[in-house]
A protein has these predicted regions:
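Small-residue-enriched, tightly packed secondary-structure blocks
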Residues: 20-180
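C-terminal motif of bacterial Sec signal peptides marking the signal peptidase cleavage site
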Residues: 15-18
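Bacterial N-terminal signal peptides that target proteins for export
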Residues: 1-8
Length: 180
């Protein structure tokens, strides 16, 4: 029995570590999605000062949210430092409140300090206090200006979600591997 448990644990650890060891790939399709999202954010005049002040920013070109009272969201994005992609970020969100539907959005996080950027890159970065209200393609996402040195902006892209909820987001960072 003990040998069986040990074998099961070793098998589970091997399977999960294999998932982590996959290289992060930044290909042409992902580059185009990133450029499209960046162009959309750069076109918003109110974000100019954030682009000017940021030491880095993370762009999430396509995120999906769904909820029926309790909800969640998931998205994959890219961290840019000095205009260059340096890694991939995963976003997972949980929220609660009056919500029903599914929605697609894109978001950008601006890092105003090296300390905030380092915290993000260490992984398991959390962003709390988000409040949303949206219906179809018209929507607003309100977040505290900086948390304390991170600002987030969201563009609703589509879907139908009636929502008044509060939630927390967690981000995990994976450095970009050099291609061989």
């Amino acid at each position: 029995m003990n040998r069986w448990k040990t074998s099961l644990i070793i098998l589970m650890l091997s399977l999960t570590s294999a998932c982590v060891m996959q290289p992060v790939v930044y290909d042409e399709a992902r580059a185009q999605a990133l450029e499209s999202a960046l162009a959309s954010f750069r076109a918003r005049e109110e974000l100019t000062r954030f682009f000017d002040q940021a030491v880095a920013y993370a762009v999430f070109p396509a995120n999906w949210r769904a909820g029926t009272g309790f909800g969640g969201a998931f998205g994959t994005g890219w961290l840019l430092e000095g205009g260059e992609v340096t890694g991939r970020a995963l976003m997972v969100e949980a929220f609660v409140g009056a919500n029903l539907g599914i929605q697609g959005d894109r978001k950008i996080l601006f890092f105003r300090s090296e300390a905030a950027l380092d915290q993000f890159k260490r992984g398991r970065f959390e962003f709390t206090g988000q409040a949303n209200a949206s219906v179809a393609n018209v929507g607003k996402a309100i977040t505290p200006g900086y948390n304390p040195d991170v600002a987030m902006f969201v563009e609703v892209r589509g879907g139908l979600m009636v929502e008044a909820s509060v939630g927390t987001q967690r981000y995990d960072y994976f450095p970009l591997q050099e291609s061989e």
